[in-house]
């Protein structure tokens, strides 16, 4: 079997968006889908590699784009410009996450009833926001995420199973924010 990696352009608020989807070429049954959500730098090669690695495990994975086609950043002072726009409008972020999930769900090799999301830093925040918004993911993993709550009401109850991988001394999410997240999700 070979892993296929292809660009997937999809629509959403403020789009179009350009992600990369990866899957095994010989699989004929519908597979679980995993949305890979990027850090502050946005969709990039490292996310595509994560998608390929998930495809090797039998998933269909979409390295999502939440900033918009052609909006890419690099390390340095401008790195957070697009993230700051979405942090200021969490409802827009939620809607872009929903559009990314819809793109994954609509891919012809994905079982739309078996969806999950993983994310790194800002992407970890995105995973938590998907669960908070009640988007149809069965589970999510936040790696060193950002834990501040959005300004919209959480789904009640949050149905997605969540794994939060976090370093206690992380300056972006200090212990008191980690405790607040635990209280929120309990």
How would you label these PLM feature ranges?
Residues 1-186:
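N-terminal cap/leader regions of alpha/beta-hydrolase-fold enzymes
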């Amino acid at each position: 079997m070979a892993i296929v990696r292809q660009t997937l352009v999809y629509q959403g608020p403020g789009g179009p968006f350009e992600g990369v989807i990866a899957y095994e070429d010989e699989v004929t049954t519908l597979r679980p889908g995993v949305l890979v959500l990027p850090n502050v730098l946005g969709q990039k090669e490292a996310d595509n590699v994560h998608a390929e690695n998930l495809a090797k495990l039998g998933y269909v994975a979409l390295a999502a784009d939440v900033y918009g086609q052609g909006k890419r950043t690099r390390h340095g002072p401008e790195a957070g410009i697009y993230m700051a726009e979405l942090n200021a409008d969490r409802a827009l972020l939620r809607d872009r996450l929903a559009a990314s999930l819809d793109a994954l769900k609509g891919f012809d090799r994905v079982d739309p009833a078996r969806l999950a999301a993983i994310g790194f830093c800002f992407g970890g925040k995105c995973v938590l926001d998907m669960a908070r918004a009640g988007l149809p993911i069965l589970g999510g993993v936040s790696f060193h995420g950002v834990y501040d709550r959005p300004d919209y009401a959480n789904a009640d109850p949050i149905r997605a199973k969540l794994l939060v991988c976090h370093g206690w001394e992380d300056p972006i999410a200090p212990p008191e924010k980690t405790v607040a997240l635990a209280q929120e999700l309990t």
